[in-house]
Amino acid sequence: MHYCNNGNISNWKVFRRLWPIINPFKIGLIIASITLIINAVSDSLMLALLKPLLDEGFGKANRSIFMWMPLVLMGLMIMRGMSGFASTYCISWVSGKVVMHIRRLLFNHIMNMPVSFFIEQSTATLMSRITYDADQVASSSSGALITIIREGASVVGLCIMMFYYSWQLSLVLILIMPIISIIIKLVSNKFKDIGKKIQNSMSQLVNSVEQMLKGHKEVLIFGGQHLEQNRFNYLSNRMRQYTMKMVQTSSVFEPLIQFVASLALACVLYIASIPSVIEMLSAGTITVIFSSMIALMKPLKSLTNVSAQFQRGMVACQTLFTILDLKTEKNIGKFSVKRVKGHIIFDNVTFFYPETNTPSLCNINFNIESGKTIALVGRSGSGKSTIVNLLTRFYDVYQGRILLDGLNLNDYTLTSLREQVSVVTQNVYLFNDTIANNIAYARTRFYSRASIEEAAKMAYAMGFISKMKNGFDTIVGENGILLSNGQRQRIAIARALLRNCPILILDEATSSLDTESECIIYKSINILKKNRTSLIIAHRLSTIENADEILVVERGSIVERGIHVDLLNHKGVYSQLYKFQFS
């Protein structure tokens, strides 16, 4: 499920797809566009004041010009200031709304992606997409929009004014426009290519930081500081190089456009120096035209830069749409149930992980009666956790079927199915929230504090919770870093008790605990297992001796099954594992 950018998609197609996101806020865009045009027109009108000032005010000593000119100038400045404020506010409002909407779309889409997607994609890359890329879409596009409208209106306004006063001199502009258009077209492709490289470099840079932070203890214990530093230095330098390529291209581009514009300016000066032409023009007209051509330099420069800015936004937008095009979890089931009995059947189930040719499970068959306990044992990588992943529909079976209360697992809605299952794993994830909110995660509105406390008591968690200063309101830190492994496990068991699901899955729930903690945890687990269909994965075979049936999994197949005593007497794989563990 790898995703990539399709460089053949045109900017127009990308923008056309972005438009439905922008469309609800088009009122802000319309106001911003109008005020940007007003802002540009006010600049042009201020230049136009030079003609009456020079021809009438100084040339003919008309004092009335000096009386009304300051008032007009002040009015134009007020108009310019107010339109500038309105345009900036509206554009910021629209871009803020757009980036918020894109982030929400992306967040919700990623949250509903299948587990396989997260195995293939790094956390840092996805975080970069939601934060950096989403911001690039809004900031680059809004910045480009401001430039295109305001500077474009300035160019149009100045050109109209120049043609109005002397169309003969202004014809030179028509000659240079095709040249400028060709240059912009050629450089735009270069900007797009560099923009993609910058985006990918940023993602890799964030990934490097994430690995160092998550593996900080390993970095320290193995002395990997030099390795991580070199990796980060290389990636940050590559990011700098791509950024400099963008600057270099832009720096060459700008003078080239300005040189073409200066040629036009030189042509105007030359034409204006011809006696037959100069007789037709006043000092004010020459000044306005010449000043307008100089004033054109700034908007032309900005318009040449807008290509790089716009390309960054479109590249980021294309990447985000590529993710949004990926299919979320398949949820075609229609059946919803409040509470199942918990009768599970694996019927000739075969499963391949994506992009592998060897089956992880092959012809798996077993039956768990409602309220019974089945244990899965076997060496690491034998396929035990895969069975759990199929039961929770993190993956779908390749061949065969899984039945729950006689109904195919695929016929249940994902929400309804997962409401029937409580899972306690070896690596418990706790959110950076209170103990109470972690126990009642995603159900805080449905459970009272009394029921949360009761679940904690049954999970033997009250002992350490009551000793904490804030009790159930204690913040546990990121991934419960302020708690020990045993404490985190008891929180997870309390969470499972509170959910009170008919099916319980214990995946190596005690493998990382010391003996004392394990004894406490198993008191909780024995309470948790009552009247529930339980599926237990365990390396410590002493913990599953009382299971109703033990399945020995080897290379994706069930090679032995039975109760503890019978399997020991059978002198097979289970017996070997047991003897090896207790030798």
Curated annotation (Swiss-Prot):
Key word Translocase present: yes
CC annotations in GO: plasma membrane
EC number, as in UniProt: 7.5.2.6
Keyword Transmembrane helix recorded: yes
Domain ABC transmembrane type-1 intervals: 30-312
InterPro entries assigned: AAA+_ATPase (IPR003593), ABC1_TM_dom (IPR011527), ABC1_TM_sf (IPR036640), ABC_transporter-like_ATP-bd (IPR003439), ABC_transpr_lipidA (IPR011917), P-loop_NTPase (IPR027417), Type_1_exporter (IPR039421)
Primary location class: membrane
Places the protein is found: Cell inner membrane
Gene3D superfamilies to which the protein is assigned, alphabetical: ABC transporter type 1, transmembrane domain, P-loop containing nucleotide triphosphate hydrolases
Domain of life the protein comes from: Bacteria
Gene Ontology molecular functions: ABC-type oligopeptide transporter activity; ATP binding; ATP hydrolysis activity; ATPase-coupled lipid transmembrane transporter activity
Lipid bilayer topology: Multi-pass membrane protein
Pfam families reported for this sequence: ABC_membrane, ABC_tran
Entry binding sites for ATP: 378-385
Annotated transmembrane regions: 18-38, 65-85, 105-127, 143-163, 167-187, 252-272, 277-297
Catalytic activity of the protein: ATP + H2O + lipid A-core oligosaccharideSide 1 = ADP + phosphate + lipid A-core oligosaccharideSide 2
This protein's UniProt keywords: ATP-binding, Cell inner membrane, Cell membrane, Lipid transport, Membrane, Nucleotide-binding, Translocase, Transmembrane, Transmembrane helix, Transport
NCBIfam families to which the protein is assigned, alphabetical: MsbA_lipidA, PRK11176.1
Function text: Involved in lipopolysaccharide (LPS) biosynthesis. Translocates lipid A-core from the inner to the outer leaflet of the inner membrane. Transmembrane domains (TMD) form a pore in the inner membrane and the ATP-binding domain (NBD) is responsible for energy generation.
Quaternary structure annotation from Swiss-Prot or TrEMBL: Homodimer.
Domain notes: In MsbA the ATP-binding domain (NBD) and the transmembrane domain (TMD) are fused.
Family per record: Belongs to the ABC transporter superfamily. Lipid exporter (TC 3.A.1.106) family.
Protein name: ATP-dependent lipid A-core flippase
Organism: Blochmanniella floridana
